Design a protein with these regions (language model features):
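A helix-coil-helix interface module used to build multimeric assemblies
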Residues: 2-143, 147
């Protein structure tokens, strides 16, 4: 189960009873949403740039966060990143690793952005990319018969 910086399950701040193992399995989306890592990192970088432009964070903090996010992207791309199912999704895995790399400044990633904002942004970016890929594949299939005829 995903935990906050105080090592509590995210939902556990109000609910004191442990969830069933079935609930934990159903709530764990990591195996599905690993594919969103590029979008999650891209969305976080853009968000941090906005925080800097709005003078919410300093140039130094912005660069530190972006450095950490880029390092995580390289780790995932090179298959050196260790996903942990106890953090239940890609967002929490990346967040936990960012805290390990840069420390408390990682907490700024959620300034003025909810988890729902993060999830929907990731999904929209992924959908945009997947749509382009489908379009490109369909163009290849459409042009293939033409090449054979001429």
């Amino acid at each position: 189960m995903a935990k906050n910086k105080n090592n509590q399950a995210i939902w556990n701040t109000r609910i004191k009873k442990n969830s069933s193992s079935l609930f934990q399995k159903v709530g764990n989306s990591l195996d599905i949403d690993k594919r969103l890592y590029k979008e999650d990192i891209k969305g976080s970088i853009v968000h941090v740039e906005m925080l800097f432009k709005q003078k919410i964070i300093s140039f130094k903090i912005k660069n530190k966060i972006i450095y950490g996010l880029n390092k995580i992207e390289r780790e995932i791309s090179s298959k050196k990143f260790e996903f942990n199912k106890k953090y239940e999704d890609i967002h929490m895995n990346i967040e936990k690793r960012l805290f390990q790399i840069i420390g408390e400044e990682a907490g700024y990633v959620h300034t003025a952005r909810s988890r729902n904002d993060q999830v929907i942004t990731d999904f929209k970016l992924w959908l945009k990319s997947a749509t382009k890929e489908i379009n490109n594949l369909s163009l290849i299939h459409i042009s293939e018969p033409t090449r054979r005829v001429f």
